[in-house]
Amino acid sequence: MSFNLRNRSLLTVQDYTPREFRYLLDLARDLKRAKYARTEQEHLKGKEICLIFEKTSTRTRCAFEVACSDQGANVTYLDPSGSQIGHKESFKDTARVLGRMYDAIEYRGSAQKGVETLAKYAGVPVYNGLTDEYHPTQMIADVMTMREHSDKPIAEIKYAYVGDTRSNMGHSLLIVGCLLGMDVRICGPRSLWPSEEYMKIAKVLQQASGARLLVTEDPREAVKDVDFIHTDVWVSMGEPKEVWRERIKLLTPYQVNQDLMKATGNPQTKFMHCLPAFHDTETTLGKQIAEDYGMDNGLEVTNDVFESEANVAFEQAENRLHTIKALLVATLGD
């Protein structure tokens, strides 16, 4: 391997250097080609991987399980009811138990401190599958997707994230672009901007990489000439209806619709979303949002944009598999 990432955890977007991040992208590309050509070699035979999900998931779980299967590893899945972590057993104690049984641990939950504690005490690589602060495995897939759909070098790609920018996706897209020297636009109402903690991290990385960074409340300014527009959901299950009402009112000007796509001035602009997306009324929650708030053509993205040729969210979802596989092979592979 060109880089030695063996036994390294991935807890935040900035854990790896730009060169290491690009190495993962190249490895993911090679593994994707091998899977399509049916020439893939197993590098994880006999490895045991534990997946801890305090928050449910479709893409992250499936990507880890298929990646492990393709590479010859075994998987144990612990769902929200299948683990005592944080309830009857501390993160520290859980780490010291699982680290003796498994070669690596993935954790998806709320607390960034939790995944960091696992990594500190497990003695094996730990991967952040999502916390309230960061979504680092998603970032590898997002940059891979942007590279696949652009003929520009990574550092010349322009993208905007529009919506609630204080979210894990907002933090992560802010930081990954600054890490890799990209043209990054972060756009949302000022009250939902990333905190100073994340801005400081981004600015340090920006100075090192030469990234261009714009944080603005103006969606048209943010999307001008971009190659990609990213967004994410505005609301989450379990939140009070009052919170939904206020946030939807605040974020409605930041909906990704045809007008915003045209405002880029670039007919080749692609739409990206980590999914799931509330773009129609074919889900229980989508129907509820339409009935309660009159948003029957989608919430954070309209259905016509989501169903258009501009949408690369499903390629983005597939790339979760290839990039997570690259992470596993790079950190555990023989």
Swiss-Prot record:
Annotated carbamoyl phosphate binding sites: 57-60, 84, 108, 135-138, 274-275, 320
Protein origin, superkingdom: Bacteria
Gene Ontology MF terms: amino acid binding; ornithine carbamoyltransferase activity
Pfam families tied to this protein: OTCace, OTCace_N
GO CC, alphabetical: cytoplasm
PROSITE patterns: CARBAMOYLTRANSFERASE (PS00097)
Cell compartments where the protein resides: Cytoplasm
Keywords: Arginine metabolism, Cytoplasm, Transferase
Main enzyme class: transferase
Catalytic activity: carbamoyl phosphate + L-ornithine = L-citrulline + phosphate + H(+)
One of the GO BP terms on file: arginine catabolic process to ornithine
Pathway membership, UniProt: Amino-acid degradation; L-arginine degradation via ADI pathway; carbamoyl phosphate from L-arginine: step 2/2
Biological function: Reversibly catalyzes the transfer of the carbamoyl group from carbamoyl phosphate (CP) to the N(epsilon) atom of ornithine (ORN) to produce L-citrulline.
Family as reported in the entry's similarity comment: Belongs to the aspartate/ornithine carbamoyltransferase superfamily. OTCase family.
Protein's UniProt name: Ornithine carbamoyltransferase, catabolic
Source organism (scientific name): Rhizobium etli
